[in-house]
Amino acid sequence: MKAIAVLKGXSEVTGVVRFEQQED
């Protein structure tokens, strides 16, 4: 769920967010 929060924070972290989301 943290990934979602990061995504809203910024879109430059979208790459990292997607990777984290898959793991979660």
Curated annotation (Swiss-Prot):
Its cofactor is Cu cation; Zn(2+). One of its GO terms (molecular function) is superoxide dismutase activity. It catalyses: 2 superoxide + 2 H(+) = H2O2 + O2. Transmembrane segments: none annotated. Keywords: Antioxidant, Copper, Cytoplasm, Metal-binding, Oxidoreductase, Zinc. The keyword Nucleotide-binding does not apply. Belongs to the Cu-Zn superoxide dismutase family. Destroys radicals which are normally produced within the cells and which are toxic to biological systems. This is Superoxide dismutase [Cu-Zn]. It comes from Aquarana catesbeiana (American bullfrog).
